[in-house]
UniProtKB/Swiss-Prot annotation:
One of its GO terms (biological process) is defense response to bacterium. Coiled coil: none annotated. It comes from Xenopus borealis (Kenyan clawed frog). It is found in: Secreted. This is Xenoposin precursor fragment B2.
Length: 24
């Protein structure tokens, strides 16, 4: 459903943000 889609998008954004945060 749409809730799982949003959850997946948030998960991807969180992973990308975490990578950028660790690298900086």
């Amino acid at each position: 459903g749409w809730a799982s889609k949003i959850g997946t998008q948030l998960g991807k954004m969180a992973k990308v943000g975490l990578k950028e945060f660790v690298q900086s």
